[in-house]
Amino acid sequence: MTQSILQSARRIVVKVGSSLVTNEGHGLDRCALGGWAGQISRLRQMGKEVVLVSSGAVAEGMQRLGWKMRPAALYELQAAAAVGQMGLAQAYADCFSEYELQTAQILLTHDDLSSRKRYLNARSTILTLLNLGIIPVINENDTVVSDEIRFGDNDNLAALVANLIEAEVLVILTDQEGLFTGDPRKNTDARLIPEVSVSDPDIEVMAGGAGSSIGRGGMQSKVMAARRAARSGAHTVIASGRAKDVLVRLAGGEAIGTILLADMPVKVARKLWLADHLQVRGSVVLDDGASRALLSGGKSLLPIGVVEIKGEFERGEAISCLDASGREIARGLINYDARESRKIMRRPTSQIEAVLGYVDEYELIHRDNLVIL
């Protein structure tokens, strides 16, 4: 399975973490960057389109600023990112030029993808760059994001980019060999899992743990990224970036690391955008009947099926739909703000006008603006 997937893939997103592009967090490792450029150039020769999601800006900024410890304050991280992003972009441009390839720097925030228009613009830009034979180098725009609107880590960002451009494979390179049955640093009996389905409930337990002090993403974030990428049909490979020529060998069909197979229904474009690219502003708790109607009946969400409103939100913003146990089962764009929603919840649609004095929509969330997770 691994061999056919990697060999047949024509569009790949490659994510390299901080530990693979820096000298243990002390500035960029130019030799490592040159190695990635060389491998990606060989993938291009194989006829594959490659988008690179690279960490390293904050680590490079810390080095240039003389900071030994990763700062906790957001404004200090943003300052380090601003300083380091210049060096990261130039270093990649220099490395890829050795192989007569041009690079393009793309910095994204969650807001860029939460707007349908900007989402499509970002997609068009990246696809145009690929058509021109240019290597897009993508990172989160750490200089301007706040905690509330950040992607979380570059594993998540890479998965969203895979969704955005409909890549067939997401390759997440890390300092670990792949997904194990347990933490190999603590359990000597832990075994590498060569292949697993993203829907396997056991993989979250196996992932456990956190990342290094250099970056933000641990194995658990990589598993969640794989599940997100699977929504657009992309398979994910988690492998060691320390393995010699790992990208070339993967593209040649060699089984390295763990492949997480996408076995989930592929979301259509608008539903995918609703599921992954909107910042959730609140949530509604549904009764059992409403949950069943959404999950099996393909129905819109009506006020009568809502038992609780959580958070504050405006009309048209994205909210989560939770079942009685608190599990998120759907996500959508709500037709009424939080104050209005609280007034009409548990009521039939025939009473909306009497309660509010007007009717904008008879549904709390129309099924066209609703995606099941």
Swiss-Prot record:
Its main location: cytoplasm. The keyword Zinc does not apply. Coiled coil: none annotated. ATP binds at residues 15, 174-175. Keywords: Amino-acid biosynthesis, ATP-binding, Cytoplasm, Kinase, Nucleotide-binding, Proline biosynthesis, Transferase. It is found in: Cytoplasm. It is an enzyme of class 2 (transferase). It comes from the Bacteria. Residues 281-359 form the PUA domain. PROSITE patterns: GLUTAMATE_5_KINASE (PS00902), PUA (PS50890). It holds the Pfam family PUA. The keyword Transferase applies. One of its GO terms (cellular component) is cytosol. GO terms for biological process: L-proline biosynthetic process. Pathway: Amino-acid biosynthesis; L-proline biosynthesis; L-glutamate 5-semialdehyde from L-glutamate: step 1/2. Its EC number is 2.7.2.11. GO terms for molecular function: ATP binding; glutamate 5-kinase activity; RNA binding. Substrate binds at residues 55, 142, 154. InterPro entries: AceGlu_kinase-like_sf, Asp/Glu/Uridylate_kinase, G5K_ProB, Glu/AcGlu_kinase, Glu_5kinase, Glu_5kinase/COase_Synthase, Glutamate_5-kinase_CS, PUA. PANTHER family: GLUTAMATE 5-KINASE, ISOPENTENYL PHOSPHATE KINASE. Catalyzes the transfer of a phosphate group to glutamate to form L-glutamate 5-phosphate. Belongs to the glutamate 5-kinase family. This is Glutamate 5-kinase. The lineage of its organism: Bacteria, Pseudomonadati, Pseudomonadota, Betaproteobacteria, Nitrosomonadales. The gene is proB.
